[in-house]
Amino acid sequence: MGLPGSIVFLIMIHAFCAKKTPTNTLPSLLSLLGITDLPSLRLNILSLDGSANNQGSWVRDNTTFVYIGASSPANGVLFYMPTSHVQQMTFYKRPVSKLLASNNLIKFLNTGSYINHSFMTAMPPYRRNVQIPSDRSGLKLDDKDDAQPTGTNPPTELKNLKPIDVVNPEHRFILTSELTGTYVKHVCFVDPMDMLIPVDYAHIRTIIFGSDGAEVIMKIGITFASITISMKSAPPVELILSERARNISLIWPALKPYEPVDKFTRRPYLIYLLGPHMNASDMEIKSYINMIESVEESSNYDFQIAQTHAQLFIFAATPISDINDIYCFRVVTTRLFMSLVASVRNAFQSGYISFDEIIKTEANIKMITETLSTFALHSNPGTYFLLSGMHLRNENADIIKSLIRKTIINASKNTASLSILQHLYVLRSAYAFNISQESGNLGEHVSSISLELIIALHEESVRDTIAWNTSARHALYYAFASIFQRPPNEWDASRTARKALLFASSMCTEEHIVATELVIQEMYIKINVKNSPVHILDVYTPCVTALRMDISEHHHRLYAMSDVILHPVIEKYLENDSRGIDAEEELETKAELVITKLKTPLMRRLTIYASEVVTCSDADILEATALLVLPISGLGSYVVTRQLGIRGIVYNVDGVDVNNQLYITYVRLPCTTTAGNIVPMVLPRPLGSDCPYCGCVLLRYSTNGNLRHTIYISSQDLQRELIAGGNSSIRYFNPTIAQIYGTSLLLYPNGTIVRILAFESERVTIISATYVATATAGASIAISIAIITVRMIINNFRYNYHRYKKLSLYDDL
């Protein structure tokens, strides 16, 4: 179909703001759009008359505005076309974006002069009589003073950085000009909701992320920014920040100014909100107000990113429901958006940005968006995507990546020289810039550094010497994340990931679960009572990574409640809450929700790294009853369940409550089912340097069917502790100090399971000398009384016997 001569080609998006003269010499419309298949969607748009005489006007007599958003040679092109021709066209293709731009165009293009259609929000003026925090008075996330440039350490160019700066990024500062170069890139903002006239602005970066349940587009500039949030379960909403000198106008009705939420705000920019207005629910209105509040509270990066983590934590602690998910998703994404706006704004105001903030910003974007897509809006985590344009020029981003690569290569040669904090900096940088996914052996180097840190922290955890502080938790998260970030088809990547999962399960002991739940409760109180700055990784636990699914079983809750007296913050909170036990139950529920939501779904993790379990299992039984999965070797895994249904070597665990049965199945292709026998034995001592128990797992369970711990024996040092018995310095291996009676099994990598008799025969009770003396004295008194009593009985018997004899003689007479 040829393009009629009366059709006017309006302009390319990048040229629109430059006011170029339109031309009418165009090729065939179909060839221009690159359309070969007939689309299933036909535009049926009625005549739309306009009265504007200006040739550059958006509305002309008997013409229709058309924006091509699909992937084609005409992508990003605006057209004016005669309405009569538009009515006959079938070329319009649904865009790849999930933001429903095509539906918006078709459904709301011909709204005429009616302003109250469902994509325009006439919010009442929003005013608050509260004190707004100063832009430069951000919350400090630690006890250290904020580092500032000095005369001897001024802001510099990226090319002057050295690899050592990667492990100490807090005291290096980058010139703002490194973000944009000599000239700031000017582009046109084309509204994804097709409601606003394109706006020219100085562009810094674009971020697009989402899943099958939602999509978010963020566009960040110096004096302009926008976020568009679209969900499968809710209408889209858009927030725009613009400098006061710029007018935002609607496409329909023609060039009508769009009113900001509050013209009288004290901020240097105006706030615009587009979203459903008519018949909006209370949740919708509440989310709008919260989005606006997040803009007006502060322009400080530290404040906004702390609020982002706080809201993400609250989201994780909130019971799952469509209403809660929609509201919380909007709140968290808006806070993340505002942290990016604040970072750019502060950098251009001060003329510099810290190297640490550049890296933390990229890491936060990845971690927060991926975490959201793990549990929000019933999304499939496998559909998560992130398209993040750096706020650095490409060549400058390459400089940073080159520094990180050099640091990683050097660190992989001598990981012992790195402290926990330095491990955190290196692994966070690798995670933020996707170094694990690069070609060559960089992924292997990152995995090596990560695994060495995990092994070191595992050793401390088993020996009860680990300090679960902020640095350790954050570093451990990035260590696991960097390993799983590596493509699983790379050499040794899957084996390393399976081993990492074993270490995670080994650190996720019963005591650690209880301690973590109490830490989460304390954070919830800090956020809701004190509004303290937090980071979601402050409560990270290996249990989030481990393939252990019994976190929410009731016995963990009981143990946590009994330990509340050791946590004054929780105890004081409960004392001031009139609900009593209900308040304590609520805190426990929130703690369990946080751990459960932050975990990667079981089937996704198994599909990637333990596919033999998925192949040999009934998916419903696996998801419903699996307590633990241990990928103990490169080919086989142990699965602990409450029901039968997994194909492999099946072990029926004896000595547990019949109502809480345990089954252990060793799974390996080709999924042949046989019955296994758990053999009781005394572990023989290995000779010389042999390590027959390396790679085994010590699994301990109680008589009521609860799993206590699964300790991975990863080295000869741990093997020596295991066979030391009562002389072992590790309490998990020492039968004389093992808490709570139970049974210990040793799981071998080849599928063999034995019961360790040492934990059943050596139950020694430690008794104080005072108790022994008291018991001895008491026993002596009891024996004396018994002797006296027996003698009295004997004497009484003799007396009665003699009387009987006398009576007998008397009768004979």
Curated annotation (Swiss-Prot):
Transmembrane segments: 770-790
Any one GO cellular component localisation term in the record: viral envelope
Intravirion side of membrane: 791-813
Glycosylated residue positions: N62, N116, N247, N279, N410, N434, N469, N576, N727, N750
Keyword field: Fusion of virus membrane with host cell membrane, Fusion of virus membrane with host membrane, Glycoprotein, Host cell membrane, Host endosome, Host membrane, Membrane, Sialic acid, Signal, Transmembrane, Transmembrane helix, Viral envelope protein, Viral penetration into host cytoplasm, Virion, Virus entry into host cell
Classification via InterPro entries: Herpes_gH, Herpes_glycoH_C, Herpes_glycoH_C_sf
Signal peptide stretch: 1-18
Membrane topology summary: Single-pass type I membrane protein
Entry keyword annotation includes Transmembrane: yes
Stretch list, region Disordered: 135-159
Subunit structure, as described in the record: Interacts with glycoprotein L (gL); this interaction is necessary for the correct processing and cell surface expression of gH. The heterodimer gH/gL seems to interact with gB trimers during fusion.
Protein name as annotated: Envelope glycoprotein H
